[in-house]
């Protein structure tokens, strides 16, 4: 059993997932959009949230032409239930429900700044102390296919005690191939750091591809790699930080 589970760790988005940041075409003052996806596994920042099991996810977003946006994300999870079982008690906490909002604006040609807030909510997680619910503020900048993002928690981070002020930084590139514009190469490198809990820090990298099937459908896969210390991320023999191939299909509407 992982020792960090005593502190209720949850860590670990690539391409499509819970990270805030709306991507949709502005065709009017107000734009509503959504995305439904099926993943072979829900991993977040390199760490499995579903104990290597599939996940069904939904994003709903609103954006105004001023740059303001707000949205929500829902996914099934297993890490809280597995943590409870590993520690001898029962939990029905099998849902993650996030709410995010912010403001995007252009500062130069092809350069966009994104500033916002993200709240991670875990309904039915009342048995866990400290609470896994987490608040983060973030700032990002994108130029063409490249994007840099920094996030910092304003609360304890995913239940880790005394971890307010933890940080996450990532650099991602999503590059459509000129010869095959429907095929996008995705690459990411990031680092998660836990305030006052440095033994949990790790780096994650991901490389993969997404193919646009048309009519809002996309399929893709990527390989994720972390250097997280296995002893802190293993529950009942399952290493949540294990290097794995993840596949997905999504529908945007």
Where in this protein do the model-derived segments appear?
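Outer-membrane beta-barrel "beta-signal"
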Residues: 144, 211-213, 238-253
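Repeated loop/turn-to-beta-strand initiation elements of outer-membrane beta-barrel proteins
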Residues: 32, 66-72, 109-115, 145-150, ...
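Cleavable N-terminal export/targeting peptides
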Residues: 1-31
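Surface-exposed loop and membrane-interface regions of Gram-negative outer-membrane beta-barrel proteins
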Residues: 68-131, 236
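Transmembrane beta-strands of outer-membrane beta-barrel pores
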Residues: 38-44, 64, 74-78, 105, ...
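Short glycine/proline- and aromatic-enriched beta-strand/turn motifs that initiate or cap beta-hairpins
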Residues: 26-80, 84, 244
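Residues that define the transmembrane beta-barrel architecture of outer-membrane proteins
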Residues: 30, 52-56, 93-97, 131-137, ...
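Detector for outer-membrane/organellar transmembrane beta-barrel domains
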Residues: 132-196, 224, 251-252
